[in-house]
Amino acid sequence: MNQVLITTRIDQFLGQPTAKTFAQLQRNLHASRSENTSAEELGELNRMLGLGDYSGVLSKSDELFDRWCLSPRFHYLRGQAALQLGDEQAAAEARALSQECLYWLCESGDGTFESPYRVTYRSDETDILMAFNLRKRNQMLVAGPNGRLDVVTMHDGVEIWFDVENAL
């Protein structure tokens, strides 16, 4: 995938966050999956944050921004690092981006089998569940009419469905 196109889509989404610009950027990120976006990268940022390497988190997240730009958790980690360094403006911007990404993820579906949430990254599932204060009992990958779906069952029996066919 052309990096210039991804950067253009990021700029379009940040300039005008809409369902359309979110979906376009999401499709472009999915198409560029060969660039090795790995959950280990988020894990590394989380580990660095836990060790108090706040400058390292910000530096590393600058490198990873183009790959993780639609991840609520990525922006949350950036915001926490900025907050620990006393940069209130950067922390507020990261919180706003985290909330914006979460909002558009939740707008991508309603969590039913017929209209699952279309996640960009596998970590988006946990972010959505946490936003609704839901605790999962179990999780299962199933074949859906348009690809792979993750069904997460809550402790009260409610099922939340996620389209993970292209999840990074």
Where are these regions (language model features)?
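Helix-start (N-cap) detector for alpha-helical repeat units in TPR-like alpha-solenoids
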Residues: 38, 72-73
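TPR repeat positional signature
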Residues: 41, 75-78
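N-terminal alpha-helical interaction modules that lie
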Residues: 1-62, 101-105, 112-168
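Heptad-repeat amphipathic alpha-helical coiled-coil interaction surface used
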Residues: 58, 78-79, 98
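TPR/TPR-like (Sel1-like) alpha-helical repeat modules
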Residues: 83-106
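Short coil turns that delineate tetratricopeptide repeat
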Residues: 68-70, 102-103
